Design a protein with these regions (language model features):
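A structural signal for short loop-to-beta-strand junctions that line the ligand-binding cleft
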Residues: 109, 136-172, 312-314, 386-393
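Extracytoplasmic "Venus flytrap"/periplasmic binding protein-like
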Residues: 74-140, 176-182, 272-274, 282, ...
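Glycine-centered hinge/linker elements that transmit conformational signals in sensory
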Residues: 191-193, 197, 233-262
């Protein structure tokens, strides 16, 4: 774990040290470039590219629109025949907005959203090898590149990524004489002591509908399982997965170690807010929690997720995606613009501003070597061993929604992990066969 982790000054130091760079380059972008495709050729002087992107900011002042405006201004100044029109929408609206545009026959040239598989399955997207220059395509972090594939062909380009770590409140741990846990039993023992010390949420277990699939996956991985097996087949009802949730039900939830709010009612945002108020001993978190906690003066540490008998061998990774639609052609111009977006300075600027991990190998190496980025180093260290959602499956969106609705029932007093996981498996198998 790098120095300065959980230290407010370290977060601020990195932020302020990057302001000049961020002002010059906006980087919400992932790239797709295309070597011209016959009839797709359009005179550069006639082209306006349409990009719909998600907003990673939490206020108007921090909106991703500002980044895109700066980025496109710089690009257009060197490419007078090409205009790039960027519309930024909240995460609540952006996926729906793109779907509406596509359904109406008005697909944007590019979309930076949460999922690509449905569009790829319908033949609406360019393949990545049709788009990106070879150096750019080869520069993606391999786990992220692999996750962008449907049927062994890459259509989705990683745009932003993050991993998860176990956050713990250093003050509460110090007062209780605890050290960070390395195993499940250690986590349960620490939670028991924290409860005896009056901590509201010894371990916060957000299985509410906001992001239950994420908390679930992190625990499944820590137990040696996952949503899919090594060949990509759904394995939700595996023995390891059922054992993991049986342990959660019996050893954490059943013993009152997850706080006064039922896991089914606790959303990630609420758990993060409680951590920032100093009410949580431990929880799984991603990089954005660092700033929220530091702003409130919470002293925290971060360690890899505990496993059954020691550190977990894998952690969860998350990526958002860029894709290019065939509808309007413009392939050559799209490709050139997106090669610019994927330049290291742009990838790093975006990552720095929103506390996300770079999606390219060269930018990741630059971040790892930069002393000002040591607060993100523990997350970056987890990326090579990370496992992502099975986003290449068109069935995943529906299965993820089912997990959000059902999974918390497995840890209720009357709940059956075996029953819930078996039901989810049946649904997943049927959906996968139909897709």
């Amino acid at each position: 774990m790098g120095p300065g982790v959980g230290d407010k000054s370290a977060v601020q130091r990195r932020k302020t040290g990057r302001t000049g760079l961020i002002a010059v380059v906006s980087a919400l972008g992932m790239t797709m470039t295309l070597a011209g495709c016959g009839g797709d050729s359009v005179s550069p002087s006639d082209v306006t590219l349409k990009l719909v992107a998600a907003d990673y900011g939490d206020s108007k002042a921090n909106s991703s629109q500002k980044y895109w405006d700066e980025l496109t201004k710089e690009y257009e100044s060197d490419h007078p025949g090409v205009k790039v029109d960027v519309s930024v929408y909240s995460w609540t609206d952006v996926d729906r907005k793109v779907k509406e545009m596509v359904d109406a026959g008005n697909a944007p040239d590019m979309a930076q959203i949460g999922a690509y598989a449905d569009y790829a399955a319908k033949g609406q997207l360019y393949r990545v090898d049709e788009l990106l220059s070879i150096p750019v395509q080869a520069n993606f972090v391999s786990q992220l590149s692999d996750a962008g594939q449907t049927n062994n062909t890459q259509y989705g380009m990683p745009f932003a990524s993050s991993t998860r770590l176990l956050f713990y409140n250093k003050t509460l741990f110090s007062q209780a004489g605890l050290t960070p846990p390395e195993s499940w039993n250690g986590l349960a023992a620490a939670a028991k002591v924290l409860k005896s010390e009056g901590v509201t949420f010894p371990y916060a277990l957000p299985l509410g509908p906001e992001e239950a699939q994420a908390e679930t996956m992190q625990w499944l991985l820590s137990g040696g399982g996952a949503y899919t097996d090594d060949v990509g087949t759904y394995s939700i009802d595996s023995e390891q997965n059922i054992k993991t949730f049986t342990w959660l039900k019996d050893e954490l939830v059943g013993k009152g170690l997850t706080g006064p709010v039922a896991p089914a009612k606790l959303n990630r945002a609420d758990a993060f807010a409680a951590f920032a108020r100093g009410e949580v001993g431990m929880l799984n978190g991603h990089p954005s929690l660092m700033q929220a906690a530091a702003k409130k003066g919470v002293q925290f540490g971060m360690v890899p997720m505990p496993g059954v008998n020691g550190r977990a061998k894998a952690t969860m990774g998350v990526a958002d995606w860029m894709m290019a639609f065939k509808k309007n052609g413009h392939a050559e111009q799209i490709g050139d613009f997106l090669d610019f977006v994927y330049d290291d300075k742009n990838v790093l600027a975006f990552s720095h501003h929103y506390d996300l991990l770079p999606v390219t190998t060269s930018a990741s190496e630059a971040m790892a070597a930069d002393e000002d980025d040591q607060d993100l180093a523990p997350f970056l260290d987890q990326l090579p061993a990370s496992v992502l959602y099975p986003v290449g499956k068109t069935s995943w969106a529906g299965i993820s929604a089912d997990i959000k609705k059902q999974i918390a029932k497995a840890v209720t007093p009357a709940g059956s992990p075996t029953g819930i996981f078996s039901s989810l498996q049946l649904t997943a198998t049927a959906a996968d066969s139909a897709s």
